Amino acid sequence: MAKNKDVRVTVILECTSCAQNDVHGNKVATGISRYITQKNRHNTPNRLEFQKFCPRCYKHTLHGEIKN
């Protein structure tokens, strides 16, 4: 019997506020702080966003789901 896609998928949450800018204002590196978690694809089809602690910013910031 064929099995459908897994319901639980592994996602990466990345800090949205700790982006380094170069001289011209272009983003060099975004989201140094990353968390790995799982989500249920059926219950949360949209991208996850959590307030998590960023050790680089040294405060709680918004962490959003990124593509794998």
Curated annotation (Swiss-Prot):
Pfam families with a match to the protein in the record: Ribosomal_L33 (PF00471)
Record keywords: Plastid, Ribonucleoprotein, Ribosomal protein
Domain of life: Eukaryota
Entry-linked Gene3D superfamilies: Ribosomal protein L33 (2.20.28.120)
GO biological process: translation
Family matches, as InterPro entries: Ribosomal_bL33, Ribosomal_bL33_CS, Ribosomal_bL33_sf, Ribosomal_zn-bd
Major localization listed first in the record, in broad terms: plastid
Molecular functions per Gene Ontology: structural constituent of ribosome
GO cellular component labels: plastid; ribonucleoprotein complex; ribosome
Classification via SUPFAM superfamilies: Zn-binding ribosomal proteins
Subcellular locations according to the entry: Plastid
Family affiliation: Belongs to the bacterial ribosomal protein bL33 family.
Entry protein name: Large ribosomal subunit protein bL33c
Species in which this protein is naturally found: Cuscuta exaltata
Taxonomic placement: Eukaryota, Viridiplantae, Streptophyta, Embryophyta, Tracheophyta
Gene that encodes the chain: rpl33
